[in-house]
C-alpha cells in the first residue's frame, strides 16, 4: 500500500510540473522595447538636488548678538533645501529649514553643567529670531564644543524639541541632546 501511495504522489507531482512547463513555454514573449532619441526641451522640468545655502545676513546678525554675550562664540546660519537644476545649468533654491552652527572653545569637555549652560545661553537667542527671518521650518542648532582641533564634542539640537523641553538648562539640557539620534 505504501508503494502505491508513493507512486501516486510521484505521478501527481510530475503532472503538475508538466502543466506549469507547458504554460511557461506557451506564454507570449514580451514586446521588444524600442528606444528613440527625442530632443529635450527646457519646459520647466528640473532635477532636484539637496542643497545648503549660506545665510550671510542672518549669520551677521547673530554674530553681532553673540559678540555681546561672549566674543568666543562663532556662529553660521544656513538654509537647507533643494536646488531645482535645469538642463541649461541655472537653478532655483527652495529652503526647507534654517540650521545654525555654533562653535564654542571650552577648557573641559566633561563638565556637562557648563556645556548645558552654554547651550541655554545660545538657544533662546535662536528661538527669539523673528519668524520671517527663518526660511522654511526650524531646523537644528549644532554645537561644537572645542577643547583642541581634535578634541571636541558635537551636540545637535532640533529646535522644535528644545522649544518643547520647557526650559531645561545645565547638565540636563546637555544630556537630553548629547546622544540624541
Stretches with model-predicted labels:
Residues 1-12:
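N-terminal Sec-pathway targeting helices
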Residues 14-24:
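Hydrophobic alpha-helical membrane-insertion segments, chiefly the h-region
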Residues 22-23, 51-107, 131-181:
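Polar/charged, Gly/Pro-rich intrinsically disordered segments
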Residues 24-45:
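Ser/Thr/Pro/Gly-rich low-complexity linker/stalk segments immediately outside membranes or between
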Residues 44-52, 102-119:
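Second-shell loop/turn segments in exported
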Residues 112-135:
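Short, non-transmembrane amphipathic alpha-helical segments
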Amino acid at each position: 500500500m505504501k508503494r502505491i501511495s508513493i507512486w501516486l504522489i510521484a505521478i501527481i507531482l510530475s503532472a503538475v510540473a508538466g502543466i506549469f512547463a507547458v504554460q511557461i513555454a506557451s506564454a507570449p514573449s514580451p514586446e521588444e522595447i524600442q528606444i528613440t532619441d527625442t530632443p529635450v526641451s527646457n519646459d520647466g522640468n528640473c532635477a532636484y538636488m539637496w542643497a545648503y545655502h549660506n545665510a550671510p545676513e542672518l549669520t551677521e546678525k547673530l554674530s553681532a548678538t553673540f559678540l555681546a554675550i561672549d566674543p568666543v562664540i562663532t556662529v553660521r546660519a544656513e538654509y537647507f533645501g533643494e536646488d531645482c537644476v535645469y538642463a541649461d545649468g541655472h537653478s532655483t533654491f527652495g529652503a526647507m529649514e534654517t540650521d545654525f552652527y555654533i562653535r564654542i572653545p571650552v577648557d573641559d569637555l566633561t563638565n556637562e553643567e557648563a556645556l548645558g549652560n552654554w547651550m541655554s545661553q545660545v538657544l533662546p537667542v535662536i528661538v527669539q529670531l523673528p519668524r520671517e527671518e527663518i526660511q522654511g521650518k526650524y531646523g537644528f542648532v549644532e554645537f561644537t564644543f572645542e577643547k583642541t582641533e581634535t578634541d571636541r564634542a558635537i551636540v545637535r539640537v532640533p529646535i522644535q524639541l528644545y522649544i518643547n523641553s520647557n526650559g531645561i538648562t545645565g547638565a540636563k539640557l546637555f544630556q537630553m541632546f548629547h546622544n540624541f539620534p
